[in-house]
């Protein structure tokens, strides 16, 4: 009922913790068996270790949070020698998030990390809003996005998914350029750029001034973008942005996503992913669906039937 097959990814269910909200899984392994997850999107990995942005770099908002972590990570060598081998104990495919400042940085990380035995796909991070070079610079220009995608595809041993930024005028144009460059799938959306001010000082709360807005506040934006992009491309989408419940996950599937990543909600409730997995079959049946594949893109597909007419 819950199985989903995507390029490189045979998922037992469509629920995946999102990169940047799950580390490398060690904190959450103390709460539940990570083998129950459809997959795991690990923390963004760069060639060299990064300390990230100065603090403060997290701020709560009324319906989510702002972060300006700045791709803090232990670097490629550490991830290959320690984090990925530790994750081999779990029966779930790993999606490695690859980041960098230049095309060669991405290629270096992609070539090596894609050869790890438990890495089944790459997530190309071209949409981080909190770094000064690389990151979102690639994700806001269709030509640059396509060139980077093509370069990484040439060296990767596994399928490549590209993470899209919502901070663009036309996300569909970016998506189509990335598809044409050979991407195997898309993940979307990354965070929206936002800011909070300290009323006492009149200054931005975050040391970076701006940060990425995530959580329930961005879900309507994410749903709209998945809905639009899924009709314009022929590669699968892993949807994300404000997912907290099985009902939220179903909404993304109906919009056109083939799987769903859960991000900020992990900070609020460490059990959120297994809870959604447990509740999803009931929610699917409640709305007349017998499988995940049956409801993907249902909101826009022309051959629509009322739920009570389906077998």
Swiss-Prot record:
Ligand binding (substrate): 43, 67-71, 125, 190-191
Name of the top EC class for this enzyme: oxidoreductase
Gene3D superfamilies: Aldolase class I (3.20.20.70)
Pfam families in UniProt: DHO_dh (PF01180)
UniProt remark on cofactor binding: Binds 1 FMN per subunit.
Keywords, sorted A to Z: Cytoplasm, Flavoprotein, FMN, NAD, Oxidoreductase, Pyrimidine biosynthesis
Record-annotated membrane-spanning stretches: none
Compartments (UniProt record): Cytoplasm
Source species, domain of life: Bacteria
E.C. numbers: 1.3.1.14
Binding-site positions, FMN: 19, 43-44, 97, 125, 163, 189, 215, 241-242, 263-264
One annotated GO biological process: 'de novo' pyrimidine nucleobase biosynthetic process
Active site: 128
Similarity section: Belongs to the dihydroorotate dehydrogenase family. Type 1 subfamily.
Task of the protein: Catalyzes the conversion of dihydroorotate to orotate with NAD(+) as electron acceptor.
Quaternary structure and partners: Heterotetramer of 2 PyrK and 2 PyrD type B subunits.
Protein name as it appears in the record: Dihydroorotate dehydrogenase B (NAD(+)), catalytic subunit
Protein source organism: Bacillus velezensis (strain DSM 23117 / BGSC 10A6 / LMG 26770 / FZB42) (Bacillus amyloliquefaciens subsp. plantarum)
């Amino acid at each position: 009922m819950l199985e989903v097959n995507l390029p490189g990814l045979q998922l037992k269910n469509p629920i995946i913790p999102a990169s940047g909200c799950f580390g490398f899984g060690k904190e959450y392994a103390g709460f539940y068996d990570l083998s129950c997850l459809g997959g795991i999107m690990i923390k963004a990995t760069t060639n060299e270790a990064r300390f990230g942005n100065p603090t403060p770099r997290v701020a709560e908002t009324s319906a989510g949070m702002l972060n300006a972590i700045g791709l803090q990570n232990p670097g490629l060598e550490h991830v290959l020698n320690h984090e990925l081998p530790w994750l081999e104990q779990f029966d779930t495919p790993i999606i490695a998030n690859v980041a960098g400042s230049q095309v060669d940085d991405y290629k270096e990380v992609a070539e090596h990390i894609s050869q790890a035995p438990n890495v089944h796909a790459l997530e190309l991070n071209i949409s981080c809003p909190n770094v000064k070079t690389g990151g979102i610079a690639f994700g806001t220009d269709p030509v640059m996005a396509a060139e980077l995608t093509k370069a990484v595809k040439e060296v990767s041993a596994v399928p490549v998914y590209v993470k899209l930024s919502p901070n663009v005028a036309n996300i569909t144009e970016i998506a189509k350029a990335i598809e044409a460059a050979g991407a195997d799938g898309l993940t979307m959306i990354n965070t929206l750029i936002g800011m909070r001010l300290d009323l006492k000082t009149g200054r931005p709360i975050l040391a970076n001034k701006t940060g990425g807005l995530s959580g329930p506040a961005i879900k309507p934006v994410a749903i709209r973008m998945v809905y639009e992009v899924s009709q314009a491309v022929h590669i699968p989408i892993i949807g994300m942005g404000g997912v907290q419940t099985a009902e939220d996950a179903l909404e993304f599937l109906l919009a056109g996503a083939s799987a769903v990543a859960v991000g900020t909600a992990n900070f609020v409730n460490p059990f959120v992913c297994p809870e959604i997995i447990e509740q999803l079959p009931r929610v699917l049946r409640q709305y007349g669906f017998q499988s995940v594949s049956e409801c993907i893109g249902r909101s826009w597909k022309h051959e629509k039937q009322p739920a009570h007419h389906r077998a």
